[in-house]
């Protein structure tokens, strides 16, 4: 079996990825690529990254056998990779630490970020405070409303939060504004992208920093059950938590990789955020080519998901490639199914999951039913649900 080795030198995953940006950004991206190549195997850099993951984030995060959830679903045993236990409450911090350490080495005193659910913004503000960097976070005005607690957290951590009023006022618009800021302040600013999208080298770099999830999980599954799971399941918006757990498994035969997108109100309604499941045509967004929700004129279609972190019209280019080469499968789960899984995990395991992660849980429970008890599923529980209790309460007609 030929070992997986992507992207190519120009940042392409087959026909996806690449660098589609304004001329003004090309030089900055080249500088970033050169610096990342220099440091990605540098022992001092890796030692500092490992130190922060252990002592600041609290890694390794455990793999946990969800016994009562397994009983409720019936069938295969369900294991959870507990990224919700990380400092700041999600997988996002793994990547922000890696990029912030790089920013420091590049002599950039200011970092900027885009955020949807607010988790990446909080993680960026956190590490900026830890390293003494100025921090500005762009967030769609709609998401600012949905995620008020995270907005306040970022401000507590010393970040400036800029609500973006253009377009659909969500993640894609925040990304556009962050890109504009970067072009303007290129000499002193490092752009910390939160997902495996954007122009090369971001999709590769974010994946590499998140791969600690899958690397740990492989070892933990071996210790727990003496083998690897039959399938690894993760939610996919941009897709960094999924890439982080998938990547170390790509060359492992017999392990299915399943990405779960947001079906919103249903794929057939058009009100969703599932470009892979819907087989959306490829297009260019935020500096890379990928599957993209667009109309016949190539205009981006507004997306919908109950979860702010999955509410994105594109997807990381590596996911697009893994779908095409059939190494990963992509499915979608509706708002209602995700909500049901959210409540189920709360009541069976005493864990309040993020609404993003609840999409992966919903599909895992469906799949487990069709399998035998001697089989095992590993779900990436990408984040905790504290940030979502306002959304869940308001759907139940409760004001907090």
Swiss-Prot record:
<dbReference type="GO" id="GO:0005737">
    <property type="term" value="C:cytoplasm"/>
</dbReference>
<comment type="similarity">
    <text>Belongs to the TrpB family.</text>
</comment>
<dbReference type="InterPro" id="IPR006653">
    <property type="entry name" value="Trp_synth_b_CS"/>
</dbReference>
<dbReference type="Pfam" id="PF00291">
    <property type="entry name" value="PALP"/>
</dbReference>
<keyword id="KW-0822">Tryptophan biosynthesis</keyword>
<dbReference type="GO" id="GO:0004834">
    <property type="term" value="F:tryptophan synthase activity"/>
</dbReference>
<comment type="pathway">
    <text>Amino-acid biosynthesis; L-tryptophan biosynthesis; L-tryptophan from chorismate: step 5/5.</text>
</comment>
<feature type="modified residue" description="N6-(pyridoxal phosphate)lysine">
    <location>
        <position position="92"/>
    </location>
</feature>
<comment type="function">
    <text>The beta subunit is responsible for the synthesis of L-tryptophan from indole and L-serine.</text>
</comment>
<keyword id="KW-0663">Pyridoxal phosphate</keyword>
<keyword id="KW-0456">Lyase</keyword>
<comment type="subunit">
    <text>Tetramer of two alpha and two beta chains.</text>
</comment>
<dbReference type="InterPro" id="IPR036052">
    <property type="entry name" value="TrpB-like_PALP_sf"/>
</dbReference>
<protein>
    <recommendedName>
        <fullName>Tryptophan synthase beta chain</fullName>
        <ecNumber>4.2.1.20</ecNumber>
    </recommendedName>
</protein>
<keyword id="KW-0057">Aromatic amino acid biosynthesis</keyword>
<dbReference type="InterPro" id="IPR023026">
    <property type="entry name" value="Trp_synth_beta/beta-like"/>
</dbReference>
<dbReference type="InterPro" id="IPR006654">
    <property type="entry name" value="Trp_synth_beta"/>
</dbReference>
<keyword id="KW-0028">Amino-acid biosynthesis</keyword>
<dbReference type="InterPro" id="IPR001926">
    <property type="entry name" value="TrpB-like_PALP"/>
</dbReference>
């Amino acid at each position: 079996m030929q070992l997986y080795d992507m992207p190519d030198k120009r940042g392409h995953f087959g026909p996806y990825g690449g660098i589609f940006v304004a001329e003004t950004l090309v030089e900055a991206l080249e500088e970033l690529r050169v610096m990342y190549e220099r440091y990605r195997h540098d022992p001092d850099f890796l030692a500092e990254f490992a130190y922060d993951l252990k002592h600041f984030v609290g890694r390794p995060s455990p793999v946990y056998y969800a016994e009562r959830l397994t009983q409720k679903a019936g069938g295969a045993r369900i294991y959870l990779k507990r990224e919700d236990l990380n400092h700041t409450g999600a997988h996002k911090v793994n990547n922000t630490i890696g990029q912030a350490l790089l920013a420091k080495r590049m002599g950039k005193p200011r970092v900027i970020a885009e955020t949807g659910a607010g988790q990446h913004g909080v993680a960026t503000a956190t590490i900026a405070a830890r390293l003494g960097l100025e921090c500005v976070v762009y967030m769609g005005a709609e998401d600012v409303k949905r995620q008020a607690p995270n907005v306040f957290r970022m401000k507590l951590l010393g970040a400036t939060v800029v609500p973006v009023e253009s377009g659909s006022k969500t993640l894609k618009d925040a990304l556009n504004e962050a890109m504009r800021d970067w072009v303007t302040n290129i000499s002193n600013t490092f752009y910390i992208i939160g997902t495996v999208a954007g122009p090369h080298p971001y999709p590769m770099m974010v994946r590499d920093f998140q791969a600690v999830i899958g690397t740990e999980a492989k070892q933990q599954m071996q210790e727990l059950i003496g083998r690897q799971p039959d399938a690894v399941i993760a939610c996919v918006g941009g897709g960094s938590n999924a890439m982080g757990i998938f990547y170390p498994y790509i060359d492992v035969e017999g392990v299915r990789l399943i990405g779960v997108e947001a079906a919103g109100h249903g794929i057939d309604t058009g009100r969703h955020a599932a470009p892979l499941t819907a087989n959306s045509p490829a297009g260019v967004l935020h500096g890379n080519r990928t599957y993209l929700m667009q109309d016949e004129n190539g205009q981006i279609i507004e997306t919908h998901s109950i979860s702010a972190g999955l509410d994105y019209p594109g997807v990381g280019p590596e996911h697009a490639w893994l779908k095409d080469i059939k190494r990963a499968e992509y499915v979608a789960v509706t708002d209602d199914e995700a909500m049901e899984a959210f409540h189920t995990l709360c009541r069976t395991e005493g864990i309040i999951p993020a609404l993003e992660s609840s999409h992966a849980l919903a599909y895992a429970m469906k799949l487990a039913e069709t399998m035998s008890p001697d089989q095992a599923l590993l779900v990436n529980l990408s984040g905790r649900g504290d940030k979502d209790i306002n959304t869940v309460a308001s759907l139940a007609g409760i004001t907090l």
